[in-house]
């Protein structure tokens, strides 16, 4: 196993910022576990549904999903994409982020977040954002500890088609 530092990708030797594991791009064999963790996030999905979503994303180099693997198990994942709009410069957006309840407060989320941020910088993005349900106070505190600032409160609207 690889020791990862807080840049979530470079090898290092013993520091308080480490965990024993690997941050890597998601693979088809991860779909069932990604689906299981999506359920913990509040978005129940099957492995087949995850596979279909990945199939739709794999033709773009502006989407990525990274997993944290610890001891042979996927402990969490983060999905990130480049968000392009007319009215502002491109930025990265984290569309999904979950760490298994059993692995929280063990630096897994920190390493996943760092990997998503590094990917965004590699894509030329100068900012990264995310949206988080108002009830997720613990997640909000985590984001703030890692340099994210609450920039606005808004209502979200959706229409089924």
Q: Which role does the model predict for each range below?
A:
Residues 3, 25-90, 95, 113-115, ...:
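Acetyl-CoA-dependent GNAT
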Residues 105-118, 141, 145:
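Conserved acetyl-CoA-binding loop-helix of GNAT-fold acetyltransferases
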Residues 120-132:
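Conserved GNAT acetyl-CoA-binding A-motif
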Residues 130-139, 158:
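Conserved beta-strand-loop-alpha-helix junction that forms the acyl-donor binding cleft
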């Amino acid at each position: 196993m690889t020791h990862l530092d807080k840049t979530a990708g470079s090898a290092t030797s013993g520091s308080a910022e480490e965990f024993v594991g690997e941050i890597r791009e998601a693979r088809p064999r991860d779909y069932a576990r990604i689906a299981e963790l999506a359920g913990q996030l509040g978005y129940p999905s099957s492995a087949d549904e995850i596979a279909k979503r990945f199939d739709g994303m794999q033709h773009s180099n502006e989407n990525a999903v990274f997993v944290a693997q610890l001891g042979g198990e996927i402990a969490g994942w983060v999905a990130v994409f480049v968000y392009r709009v007319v009215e502002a410069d491109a930025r990265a957006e984290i569309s999904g982020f979950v760490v298994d309840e059993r692995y929280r407060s063990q630096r897994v989320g920190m390493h996943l977040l760092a990997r998503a941020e590094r990917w965004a910088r590699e894509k030329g993005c100068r900012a990264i954002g995310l949206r988080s349900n108002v009830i997720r106070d613990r997640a909000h505190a985590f984001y703030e500890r890692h340099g994210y600032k609450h920039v606005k409160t808004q209502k979200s609207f959706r229409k089924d088609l």
